From Swiss-Prot:
GO biological process, one term: mitochondrial electron transport, ubiquinol to cytochrome c
Descriptive protein name: Cytochrome b
GO cellular component: mitochondrial inner membrane; respiratory chain complex III
CDD domains: cytochrome_b_C, Cytochrome_b_N
SUPFAM superfamilies (UniProt xref): a domain/subunit of cytochrome bc1 complex (Ubiquinol-cytochrome c reductase) (SSF81648), Transmembrane di-heme cytochromes (SSF81342)
Other comments on record: Heme 1 (or BL or b562) is low-potential and absorbs at about 562 nm, and heme 2 (or BH or b566) is high-potential and absorbs at about 566 nm.
PANTHER family, sorted: CYTOCHROME B
Pfam families: Cytochrom_B_C, Cytochrome_B
Keyword Heme: yes
Bilayer-spanning residue ranges: 23-43, 67-88, 103-123, 168-188, 216-236, 278-298, 310-330, 337-357
Length: 358
């Protein structure tokens, strides 16, 4: 056992890494929490459209501490995405994209996480779950020639129905373990060459053991976030949820405004800003894939852009675009929100071409 622990305990770590490097460990804690709470929820859930909604009510009311487990699982997804977006932003700000294999594995993790979260959003079988599933899976029909066939295959019929829920529950149970496998690969690749640092310089002459210095730092970060998370799940457990999802799914009544969970809203706003269906789907996928471009477009002569003022300006414009798109994704498609979505989408993609020129 000590042979397994010692390499981690004595891991040479740059002495100047800040609390922005804590999010890796926080994401690991989030993933384990989601898997454990998900297993307990799966024991009491029924993947049938006639009972799924009532089973959520049963878990909340009748299962011992069921309300707490569900609240941790539902809000844990939001905390997970907050951390992963900060983690990606930190990676861009401190030039972690020069570690190409690590960066590519990280993007794969984001896609796996988004797929897992989307499938989980469908399971309660509320109004927004049903219509969200209908709208988002319908996007697959935009694929030329095979689109409709693939959509019907995913649905298990000609509409979102019982077969769809069973399939989504199965995949939602399976994907976290694939995600865990990708995370292990990601961590292995990071520790193969060592971590980056704020200055972007070689720290081979100034490294210290991971334990006790960084174990204490990581534990402090975990306890601080645990306090904030505890407040969220106990005082305001439904703060991140959509009010429409407290109504049982009804295919005969369309909600006035269909939207996914808040962490997908930036991509959803990009999708809606393109008037063509296929173009919108391509823009949606590219909103994540384009982050990979930094691996190939950034100038390797500068190992850090921390002291580059123009880079910082472009970076914060990109961050503001992300927040603006998240806000616009929750708004109805009408003036001025539709126009603002188009402008912000153009600026968002433009930043990925402008930043390498800094």
């Amino acid at each position: 056992m000590l042979k397994l622990i010692n390499p981690l305990k004595n891991l040479p770590t740059p002495s100047n890494i800040s609390y922005m490097w804590n999010f890796g460990s926080l994401l690991g804690v989030c993933l384990l929490t989601q898997i454990i709470t998900g297993l307990f929820l799966a024991m009491n859930f029924s993947s049938d459209i006639s009972t799924a909604f009532s089973m959520i009510s049963h878990i909340q009311r009748d299962v011992n501490n069921g309300w707490l487990i569900r609240s941790i699982h539902a809000n844990g997804a939001s905390i997970f995405f907050i951390f992963i977006y900060i983690h990606v932003a930190r990676g861009i700000y401190y030039s972690s994209f020069f570690f190409k294999n690590v960066w590519i594995s990280g993007i794969l993790i984001i896609f796996a996480l988004m797929a897992t979260a989307f499938l989980g959003y469908i399971l309660p079988w509320g109004q927004m779950s049903f219509w969200g599933a209908t709208v988002i899976t319908n996007l697959i029909s935009a694929i030329p020639y095979i689109g409709m066939s693939v959509t019907y295959w995913i649905w298990g019929g000609f509409s979102v129905d019982n077969n769809t829920l069973i399939r989504f529950f199965t995949l939602h149970f399976l994907l976290p373990f694939i995600l865990l496998f990708l995370v292990v690969i990601h961590i292995t690749l990071i520790h193969e060459k060592g971590s980056s640092n704020p200055l972007g310089v070689s720290m081979n002459l100034d490294k210290i053991p991971f334990h006790p210095y960084f174990t204490i730092k990581d534990l402090l970060g975990i306890f601080v976030i645990l306090m904030i998370f505890s407040y969220s799940i106990i005082i305001n457990p439904y703060g991140f949820m959509d009010a429409e999802n407290f109504n049982i799914a009804n295919p005969m009544i369309t909600p006035p405004h269909i939207q996914p969970e808040w962490y997908f809203l930036f991509a959803y706003a990009i999708l809606r800003s393109i008037p063509n269906k296929l173009g919108g789907v391509i823009a949606l996928v590219m909103s994540i894939i384009i982050i990979l471009s930094f691996c190939f477009t950034m100038n390797n002569k500068m190992s850090s852009f921390y002291f580059n003022i123009s880079f910082k300006l472009m970076f914060w414009i990109l961050v503001n675009c992300f927040f603006m798109l998240t806000y616009l994704g929750a708004m109805p498609i009408e003036y001025p929100f539709d126009l603002m979505s188009k402008i912000t989408t153009i600026i968002y993609f433009l930043m990925f071409f402008m930043i390498p020129l800094c």
